[in-house]
């Protein structure tokens, strides 16, 4: 049986939700990943260091005995965020950065920013204190096609931000387009990007052909195949600017299979195996370790993990559903096979 040992990976973009859902989401991620950047789009959003530390305690309470897991908290950037709050966040080792959500771009983003330009004083403070800006890169104008939202955001906002604040550490999250790949490649070393399993393994045909497939629906939405290929090439290139961020986003089945279904793929139960599937498909399993375990830690200037995990080539089928305290959840890739499995 073939096997692959890599340093324990980190998930640089994760949604755990709150309350009883943590009983399901925290163990699923802690079983594999040493660290995860936890997104702040709760209701109400996590906008202060104090709120983030309270949320972190709720997460820590759900880590199973014998597991080590370090949640790194992202704060929700709003029009009311102050430079003083940036300084407070910079002094807290458990805060990784601030998340920029354009208002209305994704789940629970109503409190998001309506004017990126108005953030200049806060971005200056983030640059000064070297606090990373984590970006959901989509405009939300009603006249912009949903498949163009990322490209327009880059042109309208990200290029000006990086030109004005060249020392600001910036992560363009869950990239989906060739435009995003080009932007990150052309930017300086302070700019990086996370990539999800679904955007590497699928394109919009997998969402829309043969019926609407709600469990493949996420935001930013899956794009055409040429964009998928650009993402794949970037992940396979070994460029350290591109690294793992699942954007695993749990929603109960009833909220996905409905007339107005929620956006998000719950990939945590098979996360590292999904990435292994992608790299294996491209005969590039040797690239998995850096993508999953090295590049993100290096970008955030955090120590690389010394523990290891082992994957074995052993076909298995992802469960059709995952039980939670608030109802069944359909994981990403449900009922489909993967070729690699985490040992243990």
Swiss-Prot record:
**What pathway is it annotated to?**
Pyrimidine metabolism; UMP biosynthesis via de novo pathway; (S)-dihydroorotate from bicarbonate: step 3/3
One Pfam entry for this protein is Amidohydro_1
Q: How does it assemble?
A: Homodimer.
Q: What's one GO MF term for it?
A: dihydroorotase activity
Entry's family note: Belongs to the metallo-dependent hydrolases superfamily. DHOase family. Class II DHOase subfamily.
Catalytic activity field: (S)-dihydroorotate + H2O = N-carbamoyl-L-aspartate + H(+)
* Known role: Catalyzes the reversible cyclization of carbamoyl aspartate to dihydroorotate.
**Residues recorded as bearing N6-carboxylysine in the entry:** 99
Q: Where is the active site?
A: 247
Q: What is its EC number?
A: 3.5.2.3
Where does it sit, as one GO cellular component term?
cytosol
Please identify the protein, giving its name as recorded.
Answer: Dihydroorotase
Which UniProt key words apply to this protein? Answer: Hydrolase, Metal-binding, Pyrimidine biosynthesis, Zinc
**Note accompanying the cofactor annotation:** Binds 2 Zn(2+) ions per subunit.
**What's a GO biological-process term for it?**
'de novo' UMP biosynthetic process
* Binding sites annotated in the UniProt record for substrate: 15-17, 41, 136, 219, 251, 263
Cofactor list: Zn(2+)
> Which InterPro entries does the entry link to?
Amidohydro-rel, DHOdimr, Dihydroorotase_CS, Metal_Hydrolase
Write out the residues that bind Zn(2+) 1. Answer: 13, 15, 99, 247
Q: Tell me which NCBIfam families the record gives.
A: pyrC_dimer
What residues bind Zn(2+) 2, as annotated?
A: 99, 136, 174
């Amino acid at each position: 049986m073939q096997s692959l040992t890599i340093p324990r990976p980190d998930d640089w973009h994760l949604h755990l939700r709150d309350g009883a859902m943590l009983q399901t989401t925290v163990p699923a991620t802690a079983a594999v990943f040493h660290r995860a950047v936890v997104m702040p789009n709760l209701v109400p959003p996590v906008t202060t260091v104090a709120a983030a530390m309270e949320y972190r305690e709720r997460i820590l309470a759900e880590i199973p005995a014998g597991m080590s897991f370090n949640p790194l908290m992202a704060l929700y950037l709003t029009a009311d965020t102050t430079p003083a709050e940036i300084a407070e966040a910079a002094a807290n080792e458990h805060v990784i950065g601030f998340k920029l959500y354009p208002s209305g771009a994704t789940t629970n983003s109503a409190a998001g920013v309506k004017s990126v330009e108005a953030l200049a004083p806060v971005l200056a403070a983030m640059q000064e204190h070297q606090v990373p800006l984590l970006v959901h890169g989509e405009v939300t104008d009603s006249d912009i096609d949903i498949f163009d939202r990322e490209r327009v955001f880059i042109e309208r906002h990200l290029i000006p931000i990086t030109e004005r604040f060249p020392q600001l550490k910036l992560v363009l999250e869950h990239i989906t387009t060739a435009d995003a790949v080009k932007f990150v490649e052309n930017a300086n070393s302070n700019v990086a990007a996370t990539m999800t399993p679904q955007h590497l393994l699928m394109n919009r045909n997998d969402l829309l052909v043969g019926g609407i497939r709600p469990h493949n629906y996420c935001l930013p939405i899956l794009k055409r195949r040429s964009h998928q290929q650009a993402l794949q090439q970037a992940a396979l290139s070994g460029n350290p600017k591109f690294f793992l961020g699942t954007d695993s986003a749990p929603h109960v089945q009833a909220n996905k299979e409905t007339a107005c279904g929620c956006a998000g793929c719950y990939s945590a139960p098979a996360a590292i195996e999904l990435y292994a599937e992608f790299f294996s498909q491209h005969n590039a399993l040797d690239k998995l370790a850096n993508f999953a375990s090295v590049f993100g830690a290096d970008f955030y200037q955090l120590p690389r993990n010394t523990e290891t995990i082992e994957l074995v080539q052993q076909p298995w089928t992802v469960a059709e559903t995952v039980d939670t305290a608030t109802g069944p959840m359909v994981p990403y890739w449900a009922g489909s096979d993967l070729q690699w499995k985490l040992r243990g």
